[in-house]
UniProtKB/Swiss-Prot annotation:
It is a multi-pass membrane protein. This is Cytochrome b. Component of the ubiquinol-cytochrome c reductase complex (complex III or cytochrome b-c1 complex) that is part of the mitochondrial respiratory chain. The b-c1 complex mediates electron transfer from ubiquinol to cytochrome c. Contributes to the generation of a proton gradient across the mitochondrial membrane that is then used for ATP synthesis. Binds 2 heme b groups non-covalently. GO terms for cellular component: mitochondrial inner membrane; respiratory chain complex III. It comes from Trinycteris nicefori (Niceforo's big-eared bat).
């Protein structure tokens, strides 16, 4: 008799995606982050759902409702900090996942890569709107500063900002719509994840060597399911340690002060995972130029496949490109640090240099290095 998982209309989809899926035998732990992102998304949706049951999206009560969740709701403090720090884990896994794609040339699967970029934008938008909901000082002023950037768009900018705000400033209407979208977007992310996986399973996974692995495939279960479960345990251990020992480590103390439109905090900055983009935004003295640089800091990933000039797919056997890749990582750490510093000398010039090097590395140095490596290998 044929196994039900191979014949049932619904189960056979799951079977072909997670059980009998042929996978390269050489996948390293860097291939764990896709499944870890799935776990992060599930944790965020579940904790978010329970938080939404107690949260009120009104400027008069939003801050107090978050306090009420932490003090009066059974394990409300755990839900709130799992959700806040779960977002940090989400972005750590996201950036490592993108980094893996860049290093091993996974971007040559252009459909999967482009859906991934769309996912990155959607997750960033979701996280930004979520940061506004506790209605602390940094929530209010972060929302004001970031939404106000849209006013740099010629001709329609001012009207667009007022349309998003639902008035002439960030207020009750803004908070209500941000809550609505923050609740909706994770389900949009889940739908895009399905599309992402659909495109990935059309081509099959890449592997560390970048060489086609069709003759050497193994079933996803049990080999990679066990490997993924180990990844889940490690990530959930780190998340639990963060939540239970220092839940406010990655947060901003200003967000424990209720939002006050009459009092601007000395340093307005987003959550740590947006600091690199914020540093790129601030490094350009022109408002419209800054907004374009901010968008391009992520959108630049879309033209990486077109700039792949190497005859080899992966960087595994390309030491010069490896050096450049880790140089890029160092630049991103520098930008993250600069994004959290005040706008004064020497931070301004460091930020401008790091921003220029970020774009130059991706758009100029990496393609040129690929050509040099091709020449050295006489290809």
């Amino acid at each position: 008799m044929t196994n039900i998982r191979k014949t049932h209309p619904l189960l056979k989809i799951i079977n072909s995606s997670f059980v009998d899926l042929p996978a390269p035998s050489s996948l390293s732990s860097w291939w764990n982050f896709g499944s870890l992102l799935g776990v992060c998304l599930a944790v965020q949706i579940l904790t978010g759902l329970f938080l939404a049951m107690h949260y009120t999206s009104d400027t008069a009560t939003a801050f107090n409702s978050v306090t009420h969740i932490c003090r009066d709701v059974n394990y409300g403090w755990l839900l709130r900090y799992l959700h806040a720090n779960g977002a940090s884990m989400f972005f750590i896994c996201l950036y490592l996942h993108v980094g893996r794609g860049l290093y091993y040339g996974s971007y040559t699967y252009s459909e999967t890569w482009n859906v991934g970029i769309l996912l990155l934008f959607t997750v960033m938008a979701t996280a930004f709107m979520g940061y506004v909901l506790p209605w602390g000082q940094m929530s209010f002023w972060g929302a004001t500063v970031i939404t106000n950037l849209l006013s740099a768009i010629p001709y329609i900018g001012t009207e667009l900002v007022q349309w998003i705000w639902g008035g002439f400033s960030v207020d009750k209407a803004t908070l209500t719509r941000f809550f609505a979208f923050h609740f909706l977007f994770p389900f949009l992310v889940a739908a895009l994840v399905m599309v992402h996986l659909l495109f990935l399973h059309e081509t099959g996974s890449n592997n560390p060597t970048g060489i086609p692995s069709d003759p050497d495939m193994i079933p996803f279960h049990p080999y990679y399911t066990i490997k993924d479960i180990l990844g889940f345990l490690i990530m959930l251990t780190v998340l639990s340690a963060l939540v239970l020992f220092s839940p406010d480590l990655l947060g901003d103390p200003d967000n424990y002060t209720p939002a006050n439109p009459l009092n601007t905090p000395p340093h307005i900055k987003p959550e740590w995972y947006f600091l690199f983009a914020y540093a790129i935004l601030r490094s350009i003295p022109n408002k419209l130029g800054g907004v374009l640089a901010l968008v391009l800091s992520i959108l630049v990933l879309a033209i990486v496949p077109a700039l792949h000039l190497s005859k080899q797919r992966s960087m595994m056997f390309r030491p010069l490109s490896q050096c450049l890749f880790w140089f890029l990582v160092a630049i991103l750490f520098t930008l993250t640090w600069i994004g959290g510093q005040p706008v004064e000398y020497p931070y301004i010039i460091i930020g401008q240099m790091a921003s220029a090097l970020y774009f130059l590395t991706l758009l100029v140095f990496m393609p040129l290095t690929s050509l040099v490596e091709n020449y050295l290998l006489k290809w």
